[in-house]
Structures are given as C-alpha cells and as structure tokens.
Amino acid sequence: EGAEKVGYQTIVIGGVRDPYILRQLDSWLVTGEANIHKRIYDVYGDSISRDDYVFNIRVYGRDGVMGPLEPQKELTTHEVCLILEATAATQEIATSIATVARHKILHEPIPEWSGLITGLACTYSPAHIERGAVFRFNVNHVVEPDDPYEMFPIEYMNVN
C-alpha cells in the first residue's frame, strides 16, 4: 500500500435541526454548495479557482459513512451533523474556503423563512478546525509468489 499527500484540510462541524431545512435537505445543500462556490469566486476572483480546492459536505445521520452506497435513503432523524471539508494546496487556502463555506451555509435561506436565518449550529468556536496535511491511499499491491516465504526471507544466526 502507498499514500500520497493531497493537500491541507480545514473542517467545520455543525448540526442542523430545523425541520423545514431537514425536509428539503438535499436541495438546500445543493443550493448552498453552489452559493459557496459563487461566493468564493466573488471574494477571491481568479486568485482561487475551482481547480485549487476540493470542497465536500458530509451528512452524518443520513449517509455520512457510506455516502451514495447508503441503502437507507429516507431521512428518519430530527437532526443531522454536517462536516464541511475544504482541501487545498495550502492550509491558508483551505481555511479561507472553510470560513466562507461556514458563513454561507450558516445563513443559507429556505423558502419558508424570510430575512436572515441561522440554520447551522457550530460545535466549536472558532468554527474551523485546521487538520494540516491530509493523505489518501494510492497503491494496492497484489502479489502471488511461487513460495509463500520468498517475500519474507529468514536469516538464521548462531549466537554463543
């Protein structure tokens, strides 16, 4: 197995409990993420492009562990935990992206409410957590040796 550095990461952990948001969670997240990317462009222009970072929202309490492979498709909880993940070439960019993302999703509107809403309860203050360098697996080896011992040579020594 092998690992490679993919960049630096900053996360934000928060909960959503508003029943109006939970009823439309998927569309709220899609709109919210689009607004996050738009706001990043509005703030940073061409100095940070979409190719400079990876942004993910994990939803624990729905499919945070298995993602699209989750067999239980219906949301049956009264709250979910969102983890906003920003990964970039530098810690500074990752933290900037996470900070913008937190603010945008915190106040992402829904049709049932007018004016400014707060839809995300952040667990920590400051809300962003710098994780430092992050890695992913990049190699898996499959070997079929002729002899099961050939990959693990044994050397015997006589010690007096």
Task: Indicate where each model-derived feature is located.
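C-terminal non-catalytic interaction/assembly regions of soluble proteins
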Residues: 2-160
